[in-house]
């Protein structure tokens, strides 16, 4: 088991974390399923964007870490699912 897992993704659409393939999604799910704390690292362009395969749920992340260019309305929407940290 891991203490913390940090991953990226191709898109976040509502509570779905997406990537381009089943294989990539399954491989990213392994460390997430085995971590005590889960963090998603994405730039602000990934919000409201979907890709082929939903591999994880945003509710299962302790926080999303993103840049400070995120639109305030988008930030407010996604804070309903988890903590959003801007840097």
Label each PLM-derived region with a short phrase.
Residues 1-87:
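Conserved phosphate- and dinucleotide-binding cores of soluble alpha/beta proteins
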